[in-house]
Amino acid sequence: MNIREWPAEERPREKLLQRGAGSLTDTELLAVFLGSGVRGCNVVELSRGLLVKFGSLRRLLEADREAFVGELGLGPVRYSQLQALLEIGRRHLATSIERESAMDSPAAVRRYLKAMLRHEASEVFGCLFLDTKHRPLAFEILFRGTIDRASVYPREVVRRALVHNAAALILCHNHPSGISEPSQDDVHLTLSLKRGLALIDVRVLDHIIIGDGEPLSMVEHGWIVV
């Protein structure tokens, strides 16, 4: 059945306008984003099939370009639109958190960093630079690729801390494998950066690892001491 023939309260777009986006299912949200179906398949049926194919809304959103554009009803235009929407969401979250008076909630920090890194397909390393009151100054992704002592240069982290006049910072990187537990390289790298930054009186408050599930704090798990 064509969606135009559905009762108004059951159409995803009208439902969103009447009740808000939070009232929609994953299928309905995806249907609103896609806007239209394909021949012989309305947009809700298409959305439902895509979620079954990818396994979840999250996996669809995190799919690489090749997997995404290869599906019926998707393509490079919608892939570009989706990437733009995801980046808008990340920037909105970043701006919202950066307006806070201080980032004194570990949970808020983890939510922020997860939003910044969770959609990265490869391993990336970043820093959240903070002032003397632990208010955010800036967030930067500094390195991409395999994150170890050979690929992350302490002098570059020190240089960026000086550029931002940071008093403290929080290190972060993602594990695309989904496993959050740090490797020995992660621990050694953190200690090396901690020593280097101490020379310019910049404190390393934590190193957050983003995988599947909840982000991991190396401080809370005892891998580093501040």
Curated annotation (Swiss-Prot):
Keywords: Hydrolase, Metal-binding, Metalloprotease, Protease, Zinc
InterPro entries: MPN (IPR037518), RadC_JAB (IPR025657), RuvA_2-like (IPR010994), UPF0758 (IPR001405), UPF0758_CS (IPR020891), UPF0758_N (IPR046778)
Xref: CDD domains: MPN_DUF2466 (cd08071)
Gene Ontology terms describing biological process: proteolysis
MF-aspect GO terms: metal ion binding; metallopeptidase activity
Domain MPN: 102-224
Pfam families: RadC, UPF0758_N
Transmembrane segments: none
Family statement: Belongs to the UPF0758 family.
Name listed for the protein in its UniProt record: UPF0758 protein PP_5284
Naturally occurring in which organism (per UniProt): Pseudomonas putida (strain ATCC 47054 / DSM 6125 / CFBP 8728 / NCIMB 11950 / KT2440)
Taxonomy of the source species: Bacteria, Pseudomonadati, Pseudomonadota, Gammaproteobacteria, Pseudomonadales
